[in-house]
Amino acid sequence: MGTWILFACLLGAAFSMPLPPHPGHPGYINFSYEVLTPLKWYQNMIRHPYTSYGYEPMGGWLHHQIIPVVSQQTPQSHALQPHHHIPMVPAQQPGIPQQPMMPLPGQHSMTPTQHHQPNLPLPAQQPFQPQPVQPQPHQPLQPQSPMHPIQPLLPQPPLPPMFSMQSLLPDLPLEAWPATDKTKREEVD
């Protein structure tokens, strides 16, 4: 067992020794360039999704995550809250079931109010006037009504990364660039 340990130590020492001088080879392995440069590339590849978190790739995920929040906020302003909350939870995942699921509570709650609007003159219309009730039973206008609240919320998630990036960017170049400029000037002189 001791001979194997000694052999492993000698083998490790043999690989850690500098190479004999060859023409065109510096004689040692430059780990800072040959190993760390691919690591820097790999780290940059990993960091790019985080820097563009609020912008390109995760923007699609943010659309899907904001839809339930907005859809739950808009029905709270409606008169019938529980009917809207129950269908919106399964309708979050695909866009196709939103159209069949939305008219079902819309037909039960809004269609009788439209039929009774001539019978009940203003009190039935007043609570529904702030929200566009008449366009809601139409299916092409339903995707537009959730899209309008989503669009103002999309600029809000990118703002904190932008401010943090702006606060980091002025600090880093002020320290790094003058040092490189001075060394370049010294090399030129």
Swiss-Prot record:
Pfam families: Amelogenin
Main location per the UniProt record: secreted
Name of this chain's protein: Amelogenin
Protein's job: Plays a role in the biomineralization of teeth. Seems to regulate the formation of crystallites during the secretory stage of tooth enamel development. Thought to play a major role in the structural organization and mineralization of developing enamel.
Modified residues (Phosphoserine): S32
Annotated signal sequence range: 1-16
Positions of the UniProt region annotated as Disordered: 87-167
Assigned keywords, A-Z: Biomineralization, Extracellular matrix, Phosphoprotein, Repeat, Secreted, Signal
Protein modification: A number of other isoforms are produced by carboxy-terminal processing.
Repeat as UniProt keyword: yes
GO CC annotations, alphabetized: collagen-containing extracellular matrix; extracellular region; supramolecular complex
The keyword Kinase is assigned to this record: no
UniProt feature, compositional bias: Pro residues: 129-140, 152-161
Family per similarity comment: Belongs to the amelogenin family.
Composition-biased stretches (Low complexity): 92-107, 114-128, 141-151
The species this protein was found in: Sus scrofa
One GO term (biological process): enamel mineralization
GO terms, molecular function: calcium ion binding; identical protein binding; structural constituent of tooth enamel
InterPro entries per the UniProt record, alphabetical: Amelogenin (IPR004116)
Subcellular location: Secreted, Extracellular space, Extracellular matrix
